[in-house]
Amino acid sequence: MTVAALNKLSALSGSIQKSFSPKLISVGIIGSGNWGTAIAKICGENAKAHPDIFHPQVHMWMYEEKIQHEGKECNLTEVFNTTHENVKYLKGIKCPSNVFANPDIRDVGSRSDILVWVLPHQFVVRICNQLKGCLKKDAVAISCIKGVSVTKDRVRLFSDIIEENTGMYCGVLSGANIASEVAQEKFCETTIGYLPNSSVNPRYTPKTIQALFNRPYFRVNIVEDVPGVALGGALKNIVAVAAGIIDGLELGDNTKSAVMRIGLLEMQKFGRMFFDCKPLTMSEESCGIADLITTCLGGRNHKCAVAFVKTGKPMHVVEQELLDGQKLQGAATAKEVYEFLDNQNKVSEFPLFTAVYRIVYEGLPPNKLLEAI
């Protein structure tokens, strides 16, 4: 669907273009997978709920692809804009009629005062480059991308990478938020790390950000600890692998709870040591303890770790069989974090993180996990 056709379609939706006020804040979404679509649904609902704050249209960048729909080949954007449903990535969930799928990423960027990033982390730099020269000077961003970029020399938040490559201030949203459950409006909480007075535009306050995301089923808490929010979503995956190892060994819930507690302490220590994070962010907020519990009770990291122990197969084989070759976040993060800690001479201070790495990559027997921690 062309941008011209999209504009024509959106103009027909209540003639909302005619009532546009420059004072209203325009919201754009970068990404349209299951989580991106769920976030777009929330933003669309809140754009309608707060007509005094937000422009009624929410444009979601959707990578154009052909799909089979009702017996014929169609563009995914056309199907979405006709049915208000992402039939490929979030089937069965209706989005508000004011959310539009837009295949032109620069058009989405140029429209947006608040740009919400919800896409796989490996595409962040590429998308930043595609958006150069089209963004509003006072626009801000919110990253819903879980994980961190780790090398031997440094740990970088994806919010920092977005800031460095676009010039936009970037906050972080993270929590115990399974996309399908959020889309089904099952109650959950989330945490947004966002600094007050961070934007050159005084309109983009923490209260504005909260108004954009808070729903009766999606409770938002704003904190000033941006790195703490981001790190919780990354490091909990390592702990989830450890929890899966415990379940694979059938050592029981008491043991798993102990491993989760030790893992949380290492998450807090890592945040304090390298980012000056606030300890309470991980022990009290959804981005920390709640996300850790959810991930350790289920999910891909836990599932693959259980299979790794029970089958004795290498993790890359388990990934191939259970994830169709996708890389397991917890295992990959464990390797990256270990190499970083080794370079910092801090390996001994993080025994659980180190044990997960050595079990997955160096052949340490899984039953040695408890001895190691």
From Swiss-Prot:
UniProt-listed Pfam families: NAD_Gly3P_dh_C (PF07479), NAD_Gly3P_dh_N (PF01210)
Domain of life: Eukaryota
Positions that bind NAD(+): G31, S32, G33, N34, W35, G36, F123, K146, A179, R300, Q329
Annotated localization: Cytoplasm
Main location (coarse class): cytoplasm
Active site: K236 (proton acceptor)
GO cellular component, one term: nucleus
Enzyme type, top EC level: oxidoreductase
EC number annotated for this UniProt entry: 1.1.1.8
Catalytic function, reaction form: sn-glycerol 3-phosphate + NAD(+) = dihydroxyacetone phosphate + NADH + H(+)
Binding-site residues for substrate, renumbered to this chain: K146, R300, N301
One GO molecular-function entry: protein homodimerization activity
Positions carrying Phosphoserine: S15
InterPro entries: 6-PGluconate_DH-like_C_sf, 6PGD_dom2, G3P_DH_NAD-dep, G3P_DH_NAD-dep_C, G3P_DH_NAD-dep_euk, G3P_DH_NAD-dep_N, NAD(P)-bd_dom_sf
UniProt cross-references to Gene3D superfamilies, sorted A to Z: N-(1-d-carboxylethyl)-l-norvaline Dehydrogenase, domain 2, NAD(P)-binding Rossmann-like Domain
UniProt KW keywords: Cytoplasm, NAD, Oxidoreductase, Phosphoprotein
Alphabetical GO biological process terms: glycerol biosynthetic process; glycerol-3-phosphate catabolic process; glycerol-3-phosphate metabolic process
Protein family: Belongs to the NAD-dependent glycerol-3-phosphate dehydrogenase family.
PANTHER family from the UniProt entry: GLYCEROL-3-PHOSPHATE DEHYDROGENASE (PTHR11728), GLYCEROL-3-PHOSPHATE DEHYDROGENASE [NAD(+)]-RELATED (PTHR11728:SF8)
Name by which UniProt lists this protein: Glycerol-3-phosphate dehydrogenase [NAD(+)] 2
